[in-house]
Amino acid sequence: MSASKASTADRERAQAQEQPARQEREQATQRDSGQPEFKNGEKPAQARWFGEAADDVLTIFERSRPGRRAFVAPPLGVPDRSLDDLLPSRLRRSAPPRLPEVSEPELVRHYNRLSKRNFDLDTGFYPLGSCTMKHNPKLHERVAALDGHARLHPLQDPRRAQGALELMWQLQQALAEIAGLPYVSLQPSAGSHGELAGVLLTRAYHEDRGQRRTKVLTPDNAHGTNPATVIMAGCEVVKVGTDEQGNVDLDSLRSKASDEVACLMLANPSTVGLFESGIEEIAKIVHGVGATLYYDGANLNAIMGICRPGDMGFDIVHFNLHKSFTQPHGGGGPGAGPIAVSERIEPYLPRPVVIRRPPEADGAEPEYDLDYDRPKSIGRLRGFHGNYGVFVRSYAYIRSLGASGLREVAETAVLNANYLLARLRHHGIAEHLPAAYDRICMHEFVLSGSPMKRELKIKTLDLAKRLLDHGVHPPTVYFPLIVDEALLVEPTETETKETLDRFADALAEILREAREDPEIARGAPYTTPVRRLDEAGAARRPVVRQPC
C-alpha cells in the first residue's frame, strides 16, 4: 500500500461492524422522542430547529460513509514511497484508524447545528448558582486579541516583554487592593488550582516553623473542591457544622480548632449565599490556635469594592478571574485563580513572581522582571506564568470600572438576588419553593424543593428540566448538599428586571402545571434534541470514545 492512497477495505469492514450499533442508537433516538400521555390529553410540542432532520442527533462518526472526503490533497511532485520504507512495522497500526468519512457540506452543517444548540450567556438567562455566569464585555475580547498580547511567546526575553510584565504587575497591585492583602501570584490557572496553592502555602508556612499540622477545617456547606483540594495537598479534612441561620457554628469550630489544624477554608459570602456575620470571631478562633484563615474567592462578586477579605482577618485569598472579572468560562476554561497573601505567607509564593525595579536614572522607565530567587517558594505551579489572555481581560475590566464601578457591580448583584427572592416570596412560589434560610441573601440564594416534591409530586430535577423548555438554563440543583432538594440561584448584576420577572413567571407556570398534571414536568424537556439521558446506563456502560 502506498502512502498516498487510502485503502477502503478496512474502513468498509469497520462500517459494517458499526452498522448495528448505529441502527440501535437511531432506534433509541426515535423511542426517546416519544412523549408521555398526559391526563388532560394535551402534549407539549416537541420542537425541532428549522431545517433539522430526524437524524440530526447522530454523531459525526455515525454520519461516516466509506470513501467520502471533505478534502482531497493534490498529487505530490515526488515519487510515491511505500509505507514499509517510511515506517517500521512496530510503529504502524495494524489497521487504518476508523476516522469519520464525510463530505465538506456534511461536516460544516454538522458542527453548525451543534453550535446553534449551545446555550450560553449570549443566548439567554444563566442563573447557575455559585458560578457567576454574567455578561462578559466583548470589548475585552478585542483587547486580548491585539497582536502584542495574542502573539507574545511565553519564553520571550523579559527585556522585550516589558508591556506584558507591566500589565501583570499592575493586575497584581489591583488584586492586592481588592483583597486587602499586599502580595499576589498570578500562576494558578483555576479556582481549585488557587485552592491547592493556598493549602500548599499554608503547609509550607507551618513546616518552616517546625510544625506538622495535617488537618484542614471546612464548613459543611463548602464547595466540593475544598475537601478535594485538602486531600490533594496530603492533609485531612475536618468538617465544621453550620447553624440554622446558615453561619459557621462557632461552638463546632471551637471544638475542632487545635494545634493540629493548618487552616480553615471559608467562603464569605458562603455557598448558601449568606454573609458570615461572625467572621471576626471566626478569625480570632482560628488564629488563636496558630492556624491560618483561607478565603475561597468563589463569591467575591458580592463584596468587591465594599469590604475586603484581608480586613476580615484572612491570610490567603484566591480569586476566580473567570467569574468576578469577566473572563468567559464554561466548557473547561481557560480560567485563572490568582492568590493574594499576607506578609508572613509571602516568602512561600510560587516562583517566579513579577516584580518592578525602580528607574536607574531620572526620566527612565521602571523595569519589570521575573523573580526566581525565592528559596522558600513552593515552586512552580505550571509551565509558564498563568493564562495571560485572562489577565488582559480582567485588567481591562478593572480599569474600565474603577473602584466605584466594582462596588456598583457587587451592590447590583446583591440587589438582583434579593429582588428575585422577594418576588418569589410575594407571588405564591415560596409555598412550594421556600428559601432555605429566612434572611437577607447576598448575590445568590438557595431554595428547597421539598414541599414541591411532597405536595406536587415533582422533584427539583423535574423543575430544572422543564425550565429548559422556557429557554432558561437551570440553576444549580442538589447543591449545597445540606439543603434537601436544593436549587441554588445566582442572577448576577448584568440581568435586567424584566429577565428576572420572566424567570419568576416560568417557575410559577411550572408549578401551576404540576398542580394539574405532574407528568408534564416529569417528562420534560420537550424542546431539546436529546431528552433525558439514561443516567444509570451511562454509569454502568459508559461510551467515552468512538473506536478508532
Regions from the PLM with identified roles:
Residues P188, T242, L266-P269, L447-G449, ...:
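Short glycine-centered, acidic/aromatic-flanked micro-motifs in structured strand/loop junctions
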Residues M1-Y183, C307, R357-L381, I398-C548:
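Non-catalytic terminal extensions of PLP-dependent enzymes
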Residues A204, D208, M232, D259, ...:
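Short, well-ordered loop/turn and helix-capping segments at boundaries between secondary-structure elements
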Residues S185, V238-V240, P475:
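General small-molecule cofactor/ligand-binding pocket signal
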Residues F119-H140, Q187-G198, F325-A340, R344-I345, ...:
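Conserved phosphate/anionic-ligand binding catalytic regions in large, soluble enzymes, centered on
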Residues Q162-G163, H193-E367, Y372, K376, ...:
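Conserved PLP-enzyme active-site core in the AAT-like
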Residues P182-P188, T214-T218:
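A short, small-residue-rich loop immediately preceding and capping a beta-strand
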